[in-house]
Amino acid sequence: MGEARELLQERYTSVSSLDLISVSRRKMGAVLSTKKATKMGVDEVEVVESCMVAPCQETPRRGMWLSPLDLMLVNRGHTPAVYFYPYRSEPGDFFDVARLKAAMAKALVAFYPMAGRLGMDGNGRAEIDCTGQGALFVVARSDLTIDDFRSFLPSPELRTLFVPRVEDHSPSILCAVQVTFLKCGGVALGTALHHVAVDAISAFHFLQTWSAFSRGGGGAALELPFHDRTLLRARSPPLVHPDAFSAFCPKLNLSVEPSETVVTQAFVVSKDQVTALKRACVGGDGGRVSTFCALSAHVWRCVCVARRLPPDATTRLTFPASVRRSMRPPLPPGYCGNGIIWLGAAGKVRDVTSSESEDLVFVAGQISSAVRRMDDELVRSAIDYFELTEIDSKPAPGRMPETELRVISWLGMPVYDVDFGWGKPLAMLRAVSERAGFVYLMDNGKEDGSVRVLMSTEAAILNDFQHLLYARF
């Protein structure tokens, strides 16, 4: 580890070697975790470089039309995420900044909209202005270590420390990254990609491409992004099927009451436990159910019980689903943009929590039915609906009703495939937690079939939820 620290000191001995643009400090006055409370009260991150990385070749200069599924998210801003990489002495030049910039410049040739800016067309409709100005690239250093974040849980402090502050430059920037060299020799890579430009699938595609160029060998084997978003244009005239409303646009009234204390905790469900849940979801008919449906059904039931919801209340689980394979014809491979609509499953609390349906068949069936409903007509109806209504996607203040649960699945996505040549990340997570009632499902990164369940909920029910989550195993 001494070698790592010497490398870090050598790398920053000369400010001129970094082509320094600006230096600033972010003082952290909050405690990041109880484990390190005595050490981390006044830690800081020092930004030593901030610049724009432009595509290394000429790219199209044009206004890129945004689909209704993109416009839904125009006010959501940037999605903050952090990757942690432990120090590795081989193959040398750990997280070499020049190498990362060169790889970014290559990736932005294919993903040229990410080098543009959010703008408006002549009619006042949001679009991506493909200017080629580049992505924001920040380099920083910190006396913190990866061990200070071993719980790998999202927090406002995590975002402040490691995710680039796009608002300090221009909110119209679509792509920003920050490479923070830590005292232990490791690196925290923070990303801020604007949701109007990419959903999770497209974001991981971009990061995979960037990291592949950094590893070397050229990009011949990489899948190119597909940029024609007019494939998701509304029909003329728009037509919304009556049965589609309950599937993709359920009304939600947020409470204006002060929010309770919200905590975020990670739970690991082993491969054997996932298998047991999937068996419980199909009963004796020998059918099959996805890991997403099985885990979502179990978590939904546990939350309803932990919250002690009235038996007659209607509870609802909503989740984002990709439209890419549901359309006819399917969207081309590598479609870059937002290809997500939200679906919902609902039921009476007594049915979701009934002890007589311990096999979870009913609950999983409700979720599976919602998934099966998504066909070309449902997707087209959703696109037409969002074109007609022009919904403001800015997150509303307030808290969700206790009867609501939202599950976002990153299962099967290449979350840990962002390898720049120095190994895969030790952990990846969103840098901020959601309001109570949000759950993220993702592979645990151990390559053992286990799943990480990241739960944001009211502090008062956390212990009950944990007990219920594991009680059936």
Report the location of each language-model feature.
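Intrinsically disordered, low-complexity basic segments at termini and long loops, enriched
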Residues: M1-K27
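Soluble acyl-CoA-dependent acyltransferase catalytic core bearing the H(X)4D motif
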Residues: G29, G41, V47-R62, N75-H78, ...
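Short, surface-exposed beta-strand/loop micro-motifs that present aromatic residues
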Residues: M72, L174-T180, A436-N444
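Low-complexity, glycine/alanine/valine/leucine- and proline-rich hydrophobic stretches
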Residues: M400-F473
